[in-house]
Amino acid sequence: MAVVIKFFRWIWQKISRWVFFWKHKAKSVIMDHTDSKKNELKAEKAFKVSETFKLVEPPKEAKVSKMDVSPKVVDPCLLAKTTMDGAAVEAGRRRRSLLKLPQAAVKSVSMLMASALQSGWQMCSWKSSVSSTSVASQMKTRSPLESREAAMLREVYLVLWAIRKQLRQVARRQERRRRHHLRAHMGPQPDPAQGLKQDARSPL
């Protein structure tokens, strides 16, 4: 019974470390996003201050025509375009980092399943060997697969397998959404073979 308790403690520690790791990773992604927003705001403020200095700067020559003295006004459309482009780039980076989370989670769960199987099988085989040497009067020793620990190991493996299956479905769903989003932005591409057929049918 103590071996079973140790095994479950080990499984629980693995799962808790995995959950803590992904929580920390999500927090770091959010912190990076906020830091990039702050940097964008600082750059925009510095840009505005430099433009105001340019506007206030006096002319070098005293005798200049009125058309040369006209100050340089910042185009608001250009400024809005630059800020929108920066926000779009940052949103794309964040989306890519969030898309990688389910795939990395699938890999970590697969590694956890493999390590749980390996350690559980070693534990079951060790216990069966100990019981067979201690009980020498028995005619036939049971297989390690028929032990209670093996049944618990199978249950833990099934739970991890279900978690990995759900994570794979989430990753596939996000990949489909990303492809659909890219197709919607790019628009339908004309088929060159169809264009050649139309040219062949046309009388001109």
From Swiss-Prot:
InterPro entries attached to this UniProt entry: SPACDR
Pfam families tied to this protein: DUF4703 (PF15775)
GO biological process: spermatid development
Biased composition (Basic residues): 172-184
Compartments it resides in: Cytoplasmic vesicle, Secretory vesicle, Acrosome
Lineage top rank: taxon: Eukaryota
Record bears the keyword Phosphoprotein: yes
Protein name according to UniProt: Sperm acrosome developmental regulator
Native species: Bos taurus (Bovine)
